[in-house]
């Protein structure tokens, strides 16, 4: 049996402990990467995929930075994952799943169109149902053999939430909550996306959010809250956290006040700009 090993610098990026391979190498060479009490100083060293890793001065509680996004949502919004079956759409390394399990979730369906991305820690967790190579757009209730989801998280790229939310409503138990990550770069028109795929204009952010909230309400979701991700995406884009509630078929959806959307956009730009200024490259 072949041992499941990967380069140290690659693992740091996979787990969200470094944004790029180059930054991972710099951290390793600087002597701030540890596994338990052992310092690791060779970027190309092959190590077990499930080895615990920490970057000194940057302790991450989850298998990837994605966990920080859900952590903020659980703190800001009146919602709990305790004892719930969740579905993690676009699970990738599993940051959302890890955060949910640490907050008492009973089970997680980790759904991703990709393969071999989920952290080994989660692969080996009996509470996690790994659904790799799965295009959520074609998911049906029959795919969920261990109970229907009562809580959902969505963190997808290169696809609009408009293709995800209509499918999700056919799977959720009435009374479920959803934390959807709104990524303006995948929702705005091409003319609104700048160089390197980054959306910087607050007006575009507000417009994307207004349209997404209207769409969600038209699909029957109640929009209960809006915030912004505490970290930017890997490409530097500001992302937003949308709290949706699914009341069940035949119920009316509900939007958020426009002034609330504008307030969150303004706060996101101010906070993340200050945070960026405080962090040396």
Curated annotation (Swiss-Prot):
Its EC number is 2.1.1.-. Keywords: Methyltransferase, RNA-binding, rRNA processing, S-adenosyl-L-methionine, Transferase. GO terms for molecular function: methyltransferase activity; RNA binding. Disulfide bonds: none annotated. Pfam families: FtsJ, S4. Residues 6-67 form the S4 RNA-binding domain. SMART domains: S4. GO terms for biological process: methylation; rRNA processing. Belongs to the TlyA family. This is Putative rRNA methyltransferase YqxC.
């Amino acid at each position: 049996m072949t041992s499941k090993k990967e380069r140290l610098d690659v693992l740091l990026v996979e787990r969200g402990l470094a944004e790029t391979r180059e930054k991972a190498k710099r951290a390793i060479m600087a002597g701030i990467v540890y596994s338990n009490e052992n310092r690791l100083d060779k970027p190309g060293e092959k190590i077990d995929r499930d080895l615990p890793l920490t970057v000194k001065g940057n302790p991450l509680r989850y298998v990837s930075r994605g966990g920080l996004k859900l952590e903020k949502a659980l703190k800001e919004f009146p919602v709990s994952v305790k004892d719930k079956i969740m579905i993690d759409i676009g699970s990738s390394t599993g940051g959302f799943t890890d955060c949910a399990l640490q907050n008492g979730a009973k089970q997680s369906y980790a759904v991703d169109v990709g393969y071999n991305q989920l952290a080994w820690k989660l692969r080996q967790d009996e509470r996690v149902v790994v659904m790799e190579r799965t295009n959520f757009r074609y998911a049906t209730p029959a795919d969920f053999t261990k109970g229907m989801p009562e809580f959902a998280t969505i963190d997808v790229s290169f696809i609009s939430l408009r293709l995800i939310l209509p499918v999700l409503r056919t799977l959720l138990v009435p009374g479920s909550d959803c934390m959807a990550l709104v990524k303006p770069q995948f929702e705005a028109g091409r003319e609104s996306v700048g160089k390197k795929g980054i959306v910087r204009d607050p007006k575009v952010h507000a417009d994307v959010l207004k349209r997404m909230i209207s769409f969600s309400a038209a699909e029957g979701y109640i929009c209960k809250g809006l915030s912004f991700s505490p970290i930017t995406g890997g490409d530097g884009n500001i992302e937003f956290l949308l709290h949706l509630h699914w009341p069940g078929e035949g119920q009316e959806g509900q939007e958020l006040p426009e002034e609330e959307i504008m307030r969150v956009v303004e706060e996101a730009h101010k906070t993340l700009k200050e945070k960026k200024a405080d962090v040396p490259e």
